[in-house]
Amino acid sequence: MDTPYEKLLAKLARADVKFIIVGGVAVALNGFVRTTEDVDILIESSAENIARLLDELTGFGEGHARELSINDFTDSEGAVRIIEDFPLDVFTIMRGKRYADLIGSTKTTRINNVDVRYLDATALIGLKQDSERVQDRIDVSALRSLQNREST
């Protein structure tokens, strides 16, 4: 059974939208399965890539993303939150890091017969380790434990 977020992520990948799954879904893909309310993605911030993203989002849920434009995706910290079947947070910069900075720190998973990139444990730890959020601290601890288990 495909979840709504799996369908959307596969759709974005098929359309050649350049993105990396970050946040709770990436933590789960690295082996620490936990619930998460949203899906976080970091996108490459070129106008062409954002246009592909927006084209694919027009059919997402009720289609509220049709109201977005390329200008809504600024090169600054913070996410554009799109709430449809689930909340989707779209970042162009996350903790000072851009898509180009993190693409080398990704792994690939197969969703609906298409490869989708997600952030590896080391990079996730780097993004989350200075966070004040309790969930981020739990994630860092769990990811470090998983890394320690894998290295022994």
Model-derived features: where do they sit?
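Compositionally biased terminal segments of proteins
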Residues: 1-152
